[in-house]
A protein has these predicted regions:
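Short, basic (Lys/Arg/His-rich) helix/loop patches that form interaction surfaces
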Residues: 1-39, 43-47, 119-129, 143, ...
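Active-site/catalytic core of tyrosine-dependent DNA strand-transfer enzymes
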Residues: 1-12, 91, 95-111, 115, ...
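Basic, Lys/Arg- and aromatic-enriched nucleic-acid-binding interface segment
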Residues: 20, 96-147, 263-265
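Short, flexible loop/turn elements at secondary-structure junctions
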Residues: 31, 44, 57, 141-143, ...
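Short, charged phosphate-coordinating catalytic segments
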Residues: 34-39, 133-165, 277-284
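Catalytic-site neighborhood detector that most strongly recognizes the C-terminal catalytic loop/helix
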Residues: 41-73, 88-100, 285-329
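Conserved tyrosine-mediated DNA breakage-rejoining catalytic core shared by Y-recombinases
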Residues: 47-51, 60, 105-107, 111-122, ...
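Acidic/polar, glycine-enriched structural segments that form the non-catalytic walls/loops
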Residues: 73-80
Length: 332
């Protein structure tokens, strides 16, 4: 009815579809983040994944809305200041200060475990799981990968020279979602520490460590999972190994970082959005591209090296959070 009256006053014959197409084209032309674009287009979080993973201040959404109306010669209704406060979207985004405190407490606990007296220090099996957990944490906050079985694949899925890792964390619409994403400086250092540890482990000749030794050899050759847990029996002895799964990650993290399994995806995307990173880079990292608009599709002029814009931002973020590499401590 409103559109019909507007057409009558202006002598036009615009349809709702035409208005929607214009809005979509304007948002794309202006390079508006896909989360904000989804909100302005009236989509639900189930229809627009970036909305679900982004913590967006209301004032930012309203600012874009006013720009859009101004492009058509219109003005928005002035809202009371309190109505522009707060945020929409993800509720799993801790602020930088809160996350830094949480990670600080976790790393303080980790250092205490590793620097205590010989009687208090972890066994090799316990150390192994501490190292796997820390490696996962750093890779999570670098790649924003979805929690899946055999997390981060195998050794051949990444290259420390080119600083890229291949993620295969979701298959949908009969089209592979495999993608190359850049590794942050901290992720490269942690993977180097993990490889050194695997090499150390593969050289062990203690019969009781045979399951770990075998898994390390498989990981180094690329024939087995890169990351795996050590499973302890009730008496504390090594029982075997277990590949990394979403459920096993929850068990290992819940006592120290009691957050949802995919909290890191919310945190990474929200931080990149806050820092003004282009939406095409963010969506390429999280695997949120729409079909036909992929970052590296055949009609794109983008280069993979452009994605290092992401690591420039993430490296500074990791420094602010106080994240450190684990793997340089003496193994007992």
């Amino acid at each position: 009815d409103c559109l019909a009256r507007a057409n009558e006053r202006a002598g036009t014959a615009l349809t709702m579809r035409q208005l929607q197409n214009y809005q979509r084209a304007w948002l794309q032309r202006e390079g508006i983040d896909s989360a904000i674009a989804g909100i302005l287009r009236g989509k639900a979080a189930q229809q627009c994944s970036p909305m679900a993973y982004s913590h967006v201040p209301r004032k930012d959404v309203l600012q874009i809305w006013r720009r859009y109306l101004a492009s058509m010669g219109m003005t928005a209704v002035v809202l009371a200041p309190e109505l522009e406060q707060g945020a929409v979207g993800s509720r799993l985004y801790p602020s930088v200060g809160e996350l830094a405190r949480l990670l600080g407490n976790y790393q303080q606990y980790l250092c205490a475990r590793l620097s205590g007296s010989r009687q208090q220090r972890p066994t090799l099996t316990q150390y192994h799981n501490l190292l796997v957990r820390h490696s996962l944490l750093i890779l999570h906050l670098s790649t924003a990968a979805r929690p899946v079985t055999e997390m981060y694949g195998r050794r051949g899925d990444y290259c420390l020279i080119s600083r890229f890792i291949r993620l295969t964390d979701k298959e949908g619409r009969s089209v592979s979602s495999a993608r190359l994403v850049p590794l942050s400086a901290l992720a490269v250092q942690q993977l180097q520490a993990w490889e050194r540890y695997l090499t150390y482990l593969a050289c062990q000749r203690e019969p009781l460590l045979a399951p770990l030794v075998s898994a390390a050899e498989q990981a180094l050759s690329g024939a087995g999972a890169l990351l795996f847990w050590a499973v302890e029996a009730k008496d504390g002895s090594l029982e075997g190994t277990e590949i990394v799964t979403p459920n096993s990650m929850m068990r290992q993290f819940e006592n120290l970082l009691p957050l949802a399994p995919n909290w890191h995806r919310h945190s990474v995307r929200s931080h990149l959005l806050e820092q003004g990173v282009a939406t095409e880079f963010i969506d390429a990292l999280l695997g949120h591209e729409e079909m036909g608009t992929e970052f590296t599709n055949q009609y794109s002029s983008a280069a993979l090296s452009d994605l290092f814009t992401l690591t420039d931002v993430l490296d500074k973020w990791h420094q602010t959070l106080g994240l450190k590499v684990m793997g340089e401590w003496t193994i007992h």
